Design a protein with these regions (language model features):
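Short beta-strand elements
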Residues: 58, 89-101, 132, 142-144, ...
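Soluble catalytic regions of membrane-associated enzymes that act on cell-envelope
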Residues: 436-481
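Short amphipathic alpha-helices in soluble, non-transmembrane regions
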Residues: 76-85, 167-176, 449-457, 533-542
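Soluble periplasmic/extracytoplasmic beta-strand elements of cell-envelope proteins
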Residues: 58-62, 95, 145, 154-158, ...
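Solvent-exposed, non-transmembrane loop/terminal regulatory segments of multi-pass membrane proteins
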Residues: 23-69, 75, 122-145, 158, ...
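Extracytoplasmic
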Residues: 39, 44, 87-158, 164-167, ...
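Membrane-embedded transmembrane helical bundles of large multi-pass transporters/channels
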Residues: 1-30, 34-35, 41, 48, ...
Length: 903
C-alpha cells in the first residue's frame, strides 16, 4: 500500500497542479446563440450577412432627456458619445441624431446632408421646436433614433462581424460610464445582453460553488457526525471539479449559460459515491477491504449509469448542451475513479471515529415510519402513485418552451427593464434580415418587389422600422414627384443612387456591386412564442412572393398579347394593393386599374394637371424654348394638350427650332403629359379608398411605362428577372434553438433510457430486472414533466438537462436498493428483506438524495431564472426519485415477486 501511495499521491498532486493552470485560462460565454453549431444554415446565413453588410448585430445606447432630449446639452452629449464610439475597434458604424443621413428637397432638386451636423447644434428653443417637428415627420427618424415622446434618444451601434462583440460591448459600456455625466443611460441589444449574461455567470460561479460545498458539508456532517469523514467524501468531487475545469480551460471550452452549473453538478453528484463507500465502511467495522468488496459494484454501476445519463446529451443538436454533457460525464468518471481508488487508500490511513449504530439523521426516523406503513398496505402506495402518474401525463401536453435570452433575466434586472423600455419607445433591438440576391439592384422591378415585401412586413405588429434601399430611393423620388414610389427607368434609379452612394446607411443595406441588398427590421418582445410567430410570418410572406418576373415596355406590347398581359398586370397589382391597404373589395380595385388602360374618365383632371405642369415648364429656364408672353403660352399649351399630333403644333409655333430640338421638346412634353395622366388617375381614383397615401403611391407606380408580371413560360419577350430571397435574424435563430431544444430533450431522454436499461439489464442478468429498475425513474420523469405543465414552467436550455440527470442520478438509488434486496431476499422474507434494506441502505439513499437535492437547491440564489427553476426542479425530483426507489419499487417487487430478485 505504501508503495502505491508513494507513486499514486504525487501523480494525482502533479496532475492537479498542472490542470489548475488551465482554470486560469477558463473563459465565460453568455451567448445563447452559440447553442447552435456554426454550420447551421440559418447561422451561416446570419454570419454571411454580417460579413457583407458591416455586421449583423446592433446595440443601442439610450439617453434619457430632462424633460426631453431636444436641448443643446443632450445633443452635445450625443455628438460626443457618437464620435467616441466610432473610434472603438469592432464598431463598424454609429447612427444618432448628430450622425445620420438626411434627404431634403431644395430648389435645385435634392440635397443629401446630415440631420444635425455635430458642429451645428441648435441654440434656442425655437430652433429645437422646428427641428423636433421635422424629425417627427420623418419615418426614418421617429421611433428609431428618437422616441415619439421625445424623451429618449438612441445611438445605434453596429458591431463588426469578426470582432469579439462582448469585448466591444464592454468597452462601449466602460466608455459611456466615464463620459455620460449626469445623464441616465440604458444599454440594449444582444451584445449587451450577452455581456450581462457572462458577467452574471461569473458572479454565480463564484457565489454558488462555495455555497453548494457548504450545504453538502452540513448535510454530510449531520449524517456522519465527523469532520474527517466529510472531508474525505469531498476529496473525489473536489479533485474531479479541478481536473475538468482545468481541461476545459486548456481546450478553450468556455463555461456557457448552460454549463455554468457544472461547478455545482460535479460536487453534488460526485459526493454520492463517497457517501455509499463511507456507509459501507462503517457498516463493516471500518474493514476497508470488506467494505470495498461489498459496495464497489453498486457504486461502479451507479457511476456508469450517471455517466451515461450525462453522455446522452451529446446526441442533442445544441452545442452548449452537448459540451455540458461531454465534460460533466467526464467529471463523473473522474469522481468514480477517485472514489474507487483514492478514497479507499485515504481511509486506510485516516482514523475516523465510529458513528452511532442507531440511524439518527433527522429525516430517517420519519422515513422509517412511512416505510412501516408502506409494508402493511396492499394497494394504497401503488394507487396513489398511479393517480399521480396519470395526472402528470395529462399536464405533459401543456408544456411550453422558452429560449429567448431576455426571458432568462428577472423582471427587476436592468437587462429586462431596458428591453421593455426599448420595445415601448423604439420597437426593439433584435434584428431580422431579408437578403435579396439579383443581377442588378438598380433594376426598378427588384426595388418595387422589395418595397411590396416591406409593406407586407410593416403590417405585422411585432416587426418595426423596416428599412431597405427601396426606402431611400422611394424617399428621394417622393421629393421629386410627390409619390413615394420607385422610378420606372433604370436611368432614373441610377441618378438617385449617385446621390447616396458610399453613405454608411446605404452600405448597410446594399452591397458595393449592387447584387445583394437587405430589408432590415427589429423586434423586441422577449418570448420564444413571439420569436417563432415572427419568423413563421416572414417565411409565409416570402413563400407567397414569386421569385421570377417579366418586365415589358407598355409601348412595345405585341397586339395579340396586349389584353392578356394587361389583365395579368392588373391582377398582379390588384393583389398587391389589396394586401397593402387591407381592402377586401377586389373587383373595385381591379376595375379602377383597368380603367387606366381602357377609358378616359379622368381626362379633364389630366388636362388640368398637364396645363399647370406645361405652364411651369415653358416659364422655366430648363425649357428648350422659354415662352415669355403669357397669353401666347396659354394658347400653345391648350393646343398641345388637345392635339393628337404634338409635333405639328411645335413646328407651327417654334419654326426657328432645329428638327432635333423639336424632337427633344416633343419627348419632354409627352413625358409631362404622361405624368399628368398618371397624377390625374391617382387623384381621381384614390379618394374612394382608405389609406389614401399608400394607395396613391401604388397607383402612381402602377401607371408607369413598364409592366411587371410573374414569369410565364408562354411569353417569349420582355426582360426576365430572377431573385433569390433568404431570411435570417435573431427570431429565426431563436426558433431554431427552440426546435432543437425539443429534439434534444426527446433524443437525450430516449438515449439515456436505452443505455441505462441495457446497463441494469446486464447488471441483473434479466430483462425483467431491467424493467423493474426503470419503474422509479420513469415515474419521476413523468412527474417532472407534469410539474412543468401544471405550473406553466417552460422547457428551456437549463431544465432540458433535468430528465437525463433524473435518470443518471436516480438510477443510483434503484441500484443500491435492488442490490440490497437481492442480497437479503436469499435469507429473508420480502417484508424482512425490505426492512433490512431500509435500515442499512435507506440511510445512504436518503443522505445521498438530500445532499443532491439541497446541493442543487443553492441554484435558487442565482440570477438567471432558468437556473433558479433548475435548482427547485432538481430538488423536487431527487426527493421523488429516492422515495420511488425506497417505497414504490419494493412495493411492486412485494406484490409481483419476480423471479430475477432471487437469482
Amino acid at each position: 500500500m505504501k508503495k502505491i501511495l508513494f507513486f499514486y499521491i504525487p501523480f494525482i498532486f502533479l496532475i492537479s497542479v498542472f490542470l489548475s493552470f488551465g482554470i486560469l485560462k477558463l473563459k465565460i460565454q453568455g451567448d445563447i446563440f452559440k447553442a447552435l453549431p456554426s454550420q447551421d444554415p440559418y447561422v451561416k446565413l446570419f454570419d454571411r450577412i454580417g460579413e457583407e453588410f458591416k455586421g449583423n448585430m446592433i446595440g443601442m445606447v439610450i439617453l434619457e432627456g430632462k424633460p426631453d432630449i431636444f436641448n443643446e446639452k443632450t445633443f452635445k452629449k450625443i455628438a460626443e458619445l457618437t464620435e467616441e464610439y466610432k473610434k472603438i475597434k469592432g464598431v463598424s458604424s454609429c447612427l444618432s441624431l448628430t450622425d445620420i443621413m438626411d434627404i431634403r428637397k431644395i430648389e435645385e432638386g435634392i440635397e443629401i446632408t446630415k440631420l444635425v451636423p455635430a458642429n451645428y447644434i441648435p441654440k434656442n428653443k425655437r430652433e429645437f421646436d422646428s427641428l423636433r417637428s421635422y424629425i417627427m415627420s420623418k419615418k426614418r427618424f421617429k421611433g428609431v433614433i428618437v422616441s415619439e415622446n421625445g424623451k429618449y434618444a438612441s445611438i445605434i451601434i453596429r458591431f463588426s462581424q469578426n470582432e469579439d462583440r462582448e469585448k466591444v460591448a464592454k468597452e462601449i459600456k466602460r466608455l459611456t460610464e466615464i463620459k455620460k455625466g449626469d445623464f441616465k443611460v440604458y444599454y440594449s441589444g444582444l451584445p449587451f445582453t450577452i455581456l450581462s449574461g457572462s458577467e452574471t455567470i461569473r458572479k454565480e460561479i463564484l457565489k454558488l460553488t462555495p455555497f453548494a460545498f457548504l450545504i453538502l458539508f452540513l448535510i454530510l456532517f449531520l449524517s456522519f457526525g465527523d469532520f474527517k469523514a466529510v472531508f474525505l467524501i469531498f476529496i473525489p468531487p473536489a479533485l474531479s471539479l479541478l481536473w475538468i475545469l482545468g481541461i476545459m480551460g486548456f481546450l478553450n471550452v468556455p463555461l456557457s449559460i448552460v454549463s455554468n452549473i457544472l461547478p455545482v453538478v460535479i460536487p453534488v453528484v460526485g459526493s454520492a459515491y463517497g457517501i455509499h463507500l463511507l456507509n459501507s465502511y462503517f457498516k463493516y467495522g471500518k474493514n476497508i477491504k470488506e467494505a470495498f468488496n461489498q459496495i464497489w459494484i453498486p457504486i461502479f454501476m451507479s457511476g456508469i449509469t450517471t455517466f451515461a445519463g450525462f453522455l446522452s446529451l451529446i446526441f442533442t443538436q445544441l452545442d452548449v448542451i452537448k459540451k455540458f454533457g461531454i465534460f460533466t460525464s467526464i467529471g463523473v468518471l473522474f469522481c468514480l475513479f477517485f472514489t474507487l481508488t483514492f478514497l479507499p487508500i485515504l481511509l486506510s490511513f485516516f482514523k475516523i471515529k465510529k458513528i452511532k449504530e442507531e440511524i439518527d439523521f433527522p429525516p430517517v426516523p420519519f422515513m422509517r415510519k412511512i416505510s412501516e406503513i408502506v409494508i402493511k398496505d396492499k394497494f394504497l402506495t401503488i394507487s396513489i402513485s398511479l393517480l399521480i402518474f396519470l395526472i402528470s401525463l395529462i399536464f405533459i401536453f401543456k408544456i411550453k418552451r422558452e429560449v429567448n435570452m431576455i426571458s432568462y433575466f428577472s423582471k427587476k434586472d436592468p437587462v429586462r427593464i431596458t428591453t421593455e423600455l426599448v420595445m415601448k419607445e423604439f420597437g426593439g433591438s433584435m434584428p431580422s434580415y431579408i437578403l435579396f440576391e439579383v443581377e442588378d439592384f438598380k433594376d426598378p422591378t427588384v426595388l418595387k418587389m422589395m418595397k411590396y415585401i416591406e409593406d407586407e412586413i410593416e403590417k405585422y405588429p411585432y416587426l418595426k422600422h423596416s428599412q431597405s434601399i427601396s426606402d431611400f430611393i422611394g424617399e428621394m423620388n417622393e421629393l421629386l414627384t410627390g409619390f413615394n414610389s420607385i422610378p420606372d427607368s433604370k436611368e432614373k434609379v441610377e441618378n438617385l443612387y449617385f446621390l447616396i452612394d458610399g453613405k454608411p446607411e446605404i452600405e448597410m443595406v446594399v452591397s458595393k456591386d449592387y447584387k445583394k441588398a437587405l430589408i432590415q427590421m427589429v423586434s423586441g418582445i422577449g418570448e420564444t412564442k413571439i420569436d417563432r410567430e415572427i419568423s413563421l410570418k416572414i417565411e409565409e410572406i416570402l413563400n407567397k412572393i414569386s421569385k421570377k418576373y417579366i418586365t415589358i415596355d407598355v409601348d412595345s406590347l405585341p397586339v395579340e398579347f396586349r389584353e392578356k398581359i394587361i389583365n395579368d398586370y392588373v391582377d398582379f397589382y390588384t393583389k398587391i394593393i389589396k394586401n397593402s391597404i387591407n381592402s377586401n373589395d377586389t373587383s373595385k380595385i381591379k376595375n379602377v386599374l383597368l380603367s387606366f388602360f381602357r377609358d378616359n374618365l379622368y381626362e379633364n383632371k389630366k388636362k388640368e394637371i398637364a396645363f399647370k405642369e406645361l405652364d411651369k415648364y415653358f416659364g422655366s429656364e430648363e425649357a428648350i424654348f422659354k415662352i415669355k408672353d403669357e397669353k401666347k403660352k396659354k394658347i400653345i399649351i391648350n393646343e398641345i394638350i388637345n392635339s393628337s399630333n404634338i409635333e405639328n403644333v411645335l413646328h407651327k409655333y417654334f419654326r426657328n427650332l432645329k428638327n432635333e430640338d423639336v424632337e427633344i421638346l416633343k419627348e419632354e412634353i409627352e413625358e409631362i403629359i404622361y405624368e399628368a395622366k398618371r397624377k390625374g388617375f391617382v387623384e381621381e381614383f384614390s379618394k374612394d379608398f382608405q389609406d389614401k397615401e399608400k394607395l396613391k403611391n401604388y397607383l402612381y407606380e402602377f401607371t408607369g411605362k413598364k409592366i411587371i408580371i410573374p414569369y410565364k413560360e408562354d411569353l417569349n419577350f420582355g426582360k426576365i428577372l430572377e431573385m433569390n430571397i433568404y431570411y435570417s435574424g435573431i427570431p429565426i435563430i431563436y426558433r431554431r434553438i427552440d426546435d432543437n431544444l425539443l429534439k434534444s430533450q426527446i433524443q437525450s431522454l430516449l438515449m439515456v433510457i436505452i443505455l441505462v436499461f441495457i446497463f441494469v439489464t446486464i447488471e441483473w442478468r434479466s430483462i425483467i430486472g431491467g424493467i423493474f429498475s426503470m419503474i422509479p425513474i420513469l415515474f419521476t420523469i413523468i412527474f417532472y414533466f407534469g410539474i412543468l405543465g401544471f405550473f406553466h414552467i417552460p422547457l428551456d436550455a437549463a431544465n432540458v438537462l433535468i430528465a437525463p440527470i433524473i435518470i443518471g442520478i436516480g438510477i443510483d438509488y434503484t441500484i443500491h436498493v435492488l442490490s440490497k434486496i437481492k442480497k437479503e431476499i436469499k435469507f429473508l422474507e420480502y417484508e424482512e428483506a425490505f426492512k433490512k434494506m431500509f435500515l442499512e441502505t435507506g440511510k445512504a439513499v436518503i443522505v445521498n438524495a438530500l445532499s443532491v437535492a439541497f446541493g442543487f437547491l443553492v441554484l435558487i440564489f442565482g440570477n438567471f431564472i432558468p437556473i433558479k427553476r433548475f435548482g427547485i426542479l432538481i430538488f423536487i425530483t431527487m426527493i421523488i426519485s429516492s422515495i420511488s426507489a425506497l417505497f414504490l419499487l419494493p412495493k411492486f417487487l412485494f406484490l409481483i415477486k419476480p423471479k430475477f430478485i432471487k437469482k
